[in-house]
Amino acid sequence: MNKVLISLILLGSLLGCSGEESVTAEKTIVETFSADPQALGRGRALFQGSCAGQCHGIEGFEIDEAENLFDCNWQYGETDQEIFSVVTEGIPDTQMVGFGSNFPEGDNDLWKIIAFVRFKQEPCD
């Protein structure tokens, strides 16, 4: 009886080790930074210094005609990559100038700003 039980356990173990790796989706850079409190803190500080203080206001309070970045009604850019492009390149014929990679840590800082905005954004349908 014990030999049968041990054989079944070994067989089950071998079947479980079929060599196939489980498929897990890689996190995006925004998802990675959203899970990192230090990255979110840096994103918030950069947002307050570069975005909120100039045009967009702090967490939902817009200034002048700039977009509220914490709601779901974005006129320009829906995906993280589109938002990245808008911030780096700007929007022609608007007050939104392109920042390029002019952050102290380059593109990583911009991704941290995007992660912060996404983290604080109200849930979208």
Show the residue positions of the predicted features.
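Axial heme c-ligation environment in periplasmic c-type cytochrome domains
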Residues: I63-L69, T88-Q121, D125
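Gly/Gly-Pro-rich "capping" loops immediately C-terminal to redox-active cysteine motifs
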Residues: F33-S34, G57-T88
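The canonical Cys-X-X-Cys-His
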Residues: G43, F47-I58, I113-V117
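Sequence contexts marking disulfide-bonded cysteines in secreted/extracellular proteins
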Residues: S18, A52, H56, P123-D125
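C-terminal motif of bacterial Sec signal peptides marking the signal peptidase cleavage site
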Residues: S13-G16
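Extracytoplasmic/secreted proteins, especially bacterial periplasmic and envelope-associated proteins
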Residues: Q38, R42, L46, E78-E82, ...
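Sec-dependent signal peptide recognition
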Residues: N2-L8
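Electrostatic cytochrome c docking/interface patches
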Residues: G19-L46
